[in-house]
A protein has these predicted regions:
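Pocket-lining segment of extracytoplasmic ligand-binding domains
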Residues: 179-275
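Secondary-structure end/capping motifs
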Residues: 235-321
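Short glycine-centered helix-capping/turn motifs at secondary-structure transition points
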Residues: 49, 76, 188, 207, ...
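Sec/Tat signal peptide C-region and signal peptidase I cleavage site
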Residues: 18-25
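Positively charged n-region of N-terminal signal peptides that target proteins for export
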Residues: 1-5
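Conserved C-terminal helix/tail region of periplasmic/extracytoplasmic solute-binding proteins
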Residues: 306-350
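Short, glycine-/small- and polar/acidic-enriched structural segments
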Residues: 25-175, 191-197, 214, 221
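Bacterial N-terminal signal peptides
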Residues: 7-17
Length: 350
């Protein structure tokens, strides 16, 4: 009886040892992420174990903006990071930051926006109700989270469509967190804001100001965020980065499917609620499909990012000191290899 009793214990011990060995053998990726639904593909892949399945241990540090992760990225504390397409990114690369963009992490695809313009109820009552009315924003205060951000780019593109000079015809209120901008709108401290869609949704529901134009209308296919890697990490650990991309792209497929029909994918909705600032699955469902769109082949929207660099160079703004080339900014081979291997190897069964 003692011998029979030892067999299960031995099996358990061997199993635990194997699991511990697997954990030790997993390749570590130190990643900066932010709690935003545009990164849904990553959150899904992480929650469903796709990175683990491909032998990766993704260790996440949370940042509220990709720009805030740059110092840790440059110092070598991080291997990869979510990275917003902002003026600071171009300046960092121009100064030698070892950053290369490898994957799409959300953009304003027509029908699947992530950003939205809200205006005060007073302005809406005066007839500012769509992009066609942006001319009435002349002389008004427009709030965005940061100077040179995707939000400022979107709002500026809308002002240009209305024939306004975005540098001179409005007063920019910058470097204010989006939740605070939402409240400032309700208090009349700003006249218009460009926010993540869920903040615009909250503002409208709280009667602080209606949504009047989404980012897919202002700047169709505008890049919201990307994944970037340190160049030295990519060179030394290319297969690790490709496997990261494979797991991520599987998550992206499920993210896009759920955005179109959230009722069909309750588990995905719960994952997104728990991983983001939204927290409430009902809100996640309510704002669908306005979660952003990520390309299922992983390709970043190169033309959009290069357009942003041109925009911040002039003639209206001069936030980028020196332009960088497409070759300096991107390594598109990672997405290509990851998609090819995902289709060929089918590690997730589909």
């Amino acid at each position: 009886m003692k011998i029979l009793g030892a067999v299960p214990a031995l099996a358990i011990g061997i199993g635990a040892a194997l699991l511990a060995n697997d954990a030790r053998c997993a390749d570590v990726v130190r990643l900066a992420e932010g709690p935003f639904i545009s990164g849904g593909g990553f959150f899904i892949a992480q929650a469903l174990g796709y990175f683990n399945k491909l032998g990766l241990d993704v260790q996440v540090r949370e940042f509220q903006d990709g720009a805030l992760a740059v110092p840790s990225f440059v110092s070598g504390e991080l291997d990869m990071s979510f990275m917003t397409a902002n003026a600071g990114l171009f300046n960092s690369v121009a100064k030698g930051a070892p950053i290369v963009i490898i994957l799409d992490r959300g953009h304003n695809r027509p029908g699947r926006p992530y950003t939205v313009i809200n205006v005060t109820q007073a302005l809406a009552d005066q007839g500012v109700r769509s992009l066609a009315d942006f001319g009435k924003l002349k002389g008004k205060r427009v709030g965005v989270g940061a100077l040179g951000s995707i939000n400022q780019f979107n709002a500026a593109k809308g002002l240009l469509k209305a024939g306004l000079d975005p540098a001179k015809d409005v007063q920019w209120i910058v470097n204010v967190p989006q939740p605070d901008l939402m409240k400032m709108l309700g208090q009349g401290q700003v006249d218009a804001t460009d926010l993540a869609y869920h903040f615009g949704f909250f503002a409208q529901n709280n009667k602080w100001g209606p949504m009047i134009a989404t980012g897919d209308v202002l700047a169709p296919n505008g890049q919201i965020a990307t994944f970037a890697a340190r160049r030295d990490f990519l060179v030394k650990n290319r297969d690790v980065v490709v496997r990261f991309a494979m797991a991520y792209l599987q998550g992206v497929k499920e993210f896009n499917a759920a955005a179109e029909n959230p009722a069909k994918y309750p588990r995905i909705v719960d994952i997104l609620a728990n991983a983001t600032t939204l927290k409430n699955p009902d809100v996640v469902r309510a704002i669908a499909p306005n979660w952003s769109y990520s390309n299922e082949d992983g390709m970043p929207v190169v033309d959009s990012i290069m357009e942003m660099q041109d925009f911040w160079t002039g003639p209206y703004f001069h936030l980028v000191e020196k332009k960088v080339t497409q070759e300096e900014l991107f390594d598109l081979s990672i997405a290509k290899e990851a998609k090819a291997r995902l289709d060929r190897e089918k590690p997730f069964g589909n």
